[in-house]
């Protein structure tokens, strides 16, 4: 083969590789592969799964916001070590107490205490549980929320031992500054990213603005938008899961738009230390960058509708890439149509 042919061949090879790895889901030198969603109705009980947390190895805790008991469910999730695709999800046991369900939402595991923190929307508290499901005497010192639009998400920075949470919708005082095109307001929801130290003491908050809604909620049977989950990834990034859910009166045509945004923790931390620097002004929300987005829907021919509320880190794959695991809330497999979907997304 002559030199020119080698040059042409090399250029074609580079172009082929670029096409293979390039997509609208890749951004800022972070590669994303979506392995899609799967259901495991024969091995996982129907539920209202609103949070997921890794317990170590292949075991995970699931929060269920409508269970007849207070506690959590433990499942085992097996993944393909090369692709990160979910192979099986097996129900292990429910860890329940006689206490009333707190409308459990976000859930994280704290390795240094071997305890779980669980958000309860019903009582607007984030309290600590032991692995037997018993509530301990510790909880976050939260300001008041906004009813059912209160605290829903929870993330843990293991490097700095800092907990992050956020309301799903704006605080009452921030409502006039949200969903408006007027001066000094925002087209999306003005929320507060809040940080708490290892002693569960409040240490700072930062304004975060969601994307503007795309649907006309006045014609919806059910509508919800806002932040459904947070996740600390590595020592430099906070992932924010935004969700917009639209259900028409006919139910057919319902959809959920999901977006995962990256927020650099350097906006909140001083250098690599655990000292935070709080933004008191609402004029400059934290910067965010879209990592990945997808849409699920309910049509006459397609039943992919999935309201994703839980997100956590899975294992790292053999090539060093990171697995993100997500779980959806099916409202106990409502009407025999919705499913408890699990999804894996790969980043590096």
PLM regions and their residue ranges:
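Bacterial Sec-dependent N-terminal signal peptides
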Residues: 1-30
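Sequence/structural signature of beta-propeller domains
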Residues: 27-348
């Amino acid at each position: 083969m002559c030199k020119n042919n080698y040059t042409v061949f090399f250029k074609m090879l580079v172009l082929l590789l670029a096409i293979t790895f390039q997509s609208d889901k890749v951004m800022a030198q972070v590669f994303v592969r979506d392995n899609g969603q799967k259901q495991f109705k024969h091995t996982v009980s129907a539920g209202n799964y609103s949070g997921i947390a890794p317990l170590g190895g292949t075991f995970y805790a699931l929060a269920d916001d409508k269970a007849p008991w207070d506690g959590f469910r433990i499942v085992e999730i097996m993944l393909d070590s090369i692709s990160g695709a979910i192979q099986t999800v097996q129900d292990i046991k429910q860890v329940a107490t006689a206490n009333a369900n707190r409308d459990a939402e976000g859930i994280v595991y704290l390795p240094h205490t071997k305890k779980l923190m669980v958000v309860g929307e019903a009582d607007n508290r984030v309290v600590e549980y032991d692995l037997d499901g018993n509530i301990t005497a510790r909880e976050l010192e939260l300001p008041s929320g906004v009813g059912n639009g209160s605290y829903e998400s929870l993330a843990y920075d293991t490097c700095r031992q800092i907990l992050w949470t956020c309301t799903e919708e704006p605080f009452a005082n921030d409502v006039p500054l949200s969903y408006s095109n007027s001066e000094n307001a925002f087209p999306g929801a003005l929320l507060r990213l809040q940080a708490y130290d290892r002693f569960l003491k409040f240490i700072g908050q930062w304004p975060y603005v969601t994307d503007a809604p795309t649907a006309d909620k006045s014609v919806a049977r059910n509508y919800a938008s806002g932040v459904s989950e947070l996740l600390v990834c590595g020592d430099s990034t906070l992932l924010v899961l935004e969700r917009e859910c639209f259900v028409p009166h006919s139910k057919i045509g319902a959809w959920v738009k999901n977006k995962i945004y990256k927020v650099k923790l350097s906006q909140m931390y001083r250098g690599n230390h655990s000292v935070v620097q709080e933004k008191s002004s609402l004029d400059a929300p934290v910067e965010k960058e879209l990592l990945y987005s997808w849409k699920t829907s309910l049509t006459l021919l397609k039943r992919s509708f999935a309201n994703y509320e839980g997100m956590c880190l899975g294992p790292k794959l053999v090539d060093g890439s990171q697995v993100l695991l997500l779980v959806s809330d099916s409202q106990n497999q409502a009407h025999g149509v919705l499913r408890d979907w699990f999804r894996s997304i790969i980043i590096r």
